[in-house]
């Protein structure tokens, strides 16, 4: 397939923010792929996602930094590196630099007698970039740069622009998974729900695309969990009233301790190998060799996928330690030392698959029973503490028991016949009830950083505040909620430039909906936990714009930073719909007669 066909689609995607147009452009591109070579549909999907393969594969990245790209452009365009650097300062986009310089590259002399070069194919671009990624060892940096330069020489100026942006990790398309799923549904002749279900059970959108176009919609319906391939996790809603929680769940529920740890999906493969995925579907197996051993000893099955929480514990008392301790352990290079300093326990709460049986369509009581059968419990590897509750008093009492033992609160789960495992979905089958929700402040929310403001005075030289947004599921975009500048320690403020640097954008990212213009735009990637005084109507912020009141969105008053949430991706952030529910819930309480 001609790479120019893909590039034409990328260019059109870059020019629009309309969800309808994005889906139409993707649909036409996928139809073209099916006509030309349907076997590459998975790779085209990955390319649009800005990657060569899903992150959880654990394969190497392309591994060429900014300086290396500058050198590759200079080699390809036959100009000095200083000229590339100067133009980069002027344009702020290495892709545009490559496009301009390749358009001016010398074509006279001997080149006049050379046969016109063949059009570059997508297959060649992908395979070359893949080859670059796997170049390792001594001399690999120079080889990577020369290989990239060779690819740029074969490309048209416009193609060079997108190759460079891809290598730099800055495609700037504004395309989310939801838009790709909708387009795949169109070309496969099925519904969005069918594609989404398959993706939720097998978190590899390229692989799902290949099933859709090579095997058809019926094959998509047969997709089930597969050990070694992460399942997109089920998510919980939130409420702060025991009566409302039980009402939502149909009168009773299974209340489980909510642990302050790292959610983990533990896969036992038929060959006895254990793989661990984080909530963000990252392969974190190397960080937890102790958990690997717990699973090998404690899972009595040939193959299984179970879910639980990895919690840091005090080695002397066995009491839980904060989530930050776990993240500190993850950052340590000496894993053996980290294991001794910060030991962990695993609290299991669900089973997704076991010995050929898909458990996601089974109600919770059956899944819990099967989990009990499969797990041989030990002090380090056991089921979550849980209790069946049917009255607000029972729920409240169990909540305080959880708090007194050093945990966050409860997750209360439906136990009726339809209490299935909704992979990748947030719904009212699971409801969080945390201690933070008992305060007079608004519930803490997880928001995505989309901009930053320079600090003044004591904060000079770094950023003093962040623009944060909720996830707008309807538009597959990020809508602003507030500007947060308090709650940061001096150390956290000092780290902000380094933390934000990989995500800084010269222009507003396509998926960001904002009336506020920060000093620096930030591509949606980092998630922060924020708390505030209340949720109010706002003529400035765009979260839930026009949904509650015409012309107004919702904002958080007096927001305060609590902590970073490295375990969450941008689409895992609190949704604008959830913020609307929080606003209405608070409003209802204010309006209730005393």
From Swiss-Prot:
It comes from the Archaea. Its cofactor is Mg(2+). Keywords: ATP-binding, Cell cycle, Cell division, DNA damage, DNA recombination, DNA repair, DNA replication, Ligase, Magnesium, Metal-binding, Nucleotide-binding. SUPFAM superfamilies: ATP-dependent DNA ligase DNA-binding domain, DNA ligase/mRNA capping enzyme, catalytic domain, Nucleic acid-binding proteins. InterPro entries: ATP-dep_DNA_ligase, DNA_ligae_ATP-dep_bac/arc, DNA_ligase_ATP-dep, DNA_ligase_ATP-dep_C, DNA_ligase_ATP-dep_cent, DNA_ligase_ATP-dep_CS, DNA_ligase_ATP-dep_N, DNA_ligase_N_sf. PROSITE patterns: DNA_LIGASE_A1, DNA_LIGASE_A2, DNA_LIGASE_A3. ATP binds at residues 256, 263, 279, 309, 349, 426, 432. CDD domains: Adenylation_DNA_ligase_Arch_LigB, OBF_DNA_ligase_I. This is DNA ligase. It comes from Ignicoccus hospitalis (strain KIN4/I / DSM 18386 / JCM 14125). The lineage of its organism: Archaea, Thermoproteota, Thermoprotei, Desulfurococcales, Desulfurococcaceae.
